[in-house]
Amino acid sequence: INNDGDLSNVQSIGTNDGLWIDAPTDFATTSIGDHTYVIIASADTDSLSVVEVAPDGSMIVRDHLMDSRETRFGGVASVEIVQSDGKTYVVAGGADDGVSVLLLLEGGLLIHRASIEDTIDYSLDNISALAAVQRAAGLEIFVASSS
């Protein structure tokens, strides 16, 4: 937003810049040290992308992670970021009937830490929204299912 209240486009990013996604479904932002990151979820490409945003508004793709057998964020609909004990966690879920927890490192690298899949004990079918908070005993993840 300019000083006179008008909006202006500082920069956009896409496939020519290494952001190989289709139809982003959610995003969340965080800072680690002096660096600002946007985590972009895309259901159509079953992926999470990390984009660093510089102070001048320029952007660069730092990581791009595809869903696999070990993760549960295929068809990702929701992404949440929570910081705990000096670490930054990314929580993602969607149509793959589960939740993935990833660690975001300084430099923008995502590391898969854990996944929980839908079972008879959990209602994680078609996740539509989630939230995560830090508590004394660790992280609590709240999940809403659309089915």
Show where each model-derived region lies.
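Feature marking well-ordered beta-strand scaffolds used for ligand recognition
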Residues: 1-147
